[in-house]
């Protein structure tokens, strides 16, 4: 079934020879794509001659749907083998690990992931997403197999930490190719809704991770925590193959026009003349490292990720040890947080596009205020309160926090040229994971152990306030960029209407003369 669905490249290549007389042989160029020293099989594919308009209109929608499903399945799969330490935190604690030990192990993955997401993005922007994403998933799966193998006997914190670091490096190969595919196949004006829909991969993957781990512990024994790593990894190998068959890197490599041309929707930040002559590093430095708006966005991501991981990573342990729940109830809280994020993410994307007209920062601020209220509900009830109270608070927190998580990644794509969009998103991700996730794992673990959970919750609320301030700073520049993009789009459409009117007038005059 897969082969019959995904062999369009071979079919289309065969039809090209028969349609030589009608095919526009103008090459569909990928403007200013960086040069690459990657192995030939991993490089971004070269553009092919443009296909006839009838063929373009038939193929474009189908491939857009196909690649979207591909990056959805692919990125959700990474989550099946990412945050599994948190899911077995209570079991690890019963086996002698302290909160600080667990925090360090979890932080090794998050820290490595943050750096990898940035540096992998600089490679991914020159690589074929069809190969790059499945490759990272397979390598991450193999690392989780090694974690399961090394689990026999006494738990070694150092070995565990090293393997989680390696896992984090390969995990960083997931988001950048997905972001690259998103900017090449979906235009700016539609990207809010599409990005929101794709972003629920965080929640789908996270929730399925909890379900797979719960099944593994139930089937292979509640003390067999190694199964929480190797069992989901086996599933990921299959999903990596499916991802490979679905994903296509960019429209031009399929003989299609760019999405900006196809939808008449220019990018907010276009490739300029300097981008075409300077090195990739010079472009990154100019558009990202020396761009105050991008720096504000990166620091906002620090505090958003502190809240995201500070809540969900410690939920299984907090619910078991403080709220008196079982291990399964703690894992249920983790999954509730993730599942609720689906609704919140979709709602956030809709509000961002329809209510605030693309002003992502304002939408993020509104959602972060809601996160503060959810954290208070999670913290303030007495320890003997029913478990549904804590689950409700986690549902609200998950539904609200994933909106800003999605928006910041989307803003990084919107506020940078397409050929370094993945790197821009990787830059904000680097800050989110290297700093935010560190504070969420090691930081909150140390605060809770030495100062109590009350101090940890106060810390989370402070982080939420700081994220609101930084998003306010980003909003000022965002308004300016959006105004320029709308003016340009309106000018192009006005010109097209004038040309169409002139053509109609010319045709009418010709008919009168005849």
Q: How would you name each of these model-derived features?
A:
Residues 198-252:
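Helix-loop-helix hairpin linking two adjacent transmembrane segments in secondary transporters
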Residues 138-154, 369-383:
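C-terminal ends and interior cores of transmembrane alpha-helices
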Residues 163-201:
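Cytoplasmic helix-loop-helix junction between adjacent transmembrane helices
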Residues 126-137, 354-368:
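Cytoplasmic membrane-interface "Motif A"-like loop-to-helix N-cap segments
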Residues 192-213, 217, 341, 429-440:
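Glycine-rich segments within core transmembrane alpha-helices of 12-TM secondary carriers
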Residues 358-408:
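C-terminal transmembrane helical hairpin of 12-TM major facilitator-type secondary transporters
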Residues 85-87, 290-346, 405, 437-441:
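Extracytoplasmic gate region of multi-pass secondary transporters
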Residues 48-61, 254-296, 492:
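Juxtamembrane intracellular "pre-TM" segments in multi-pass secondary transporters
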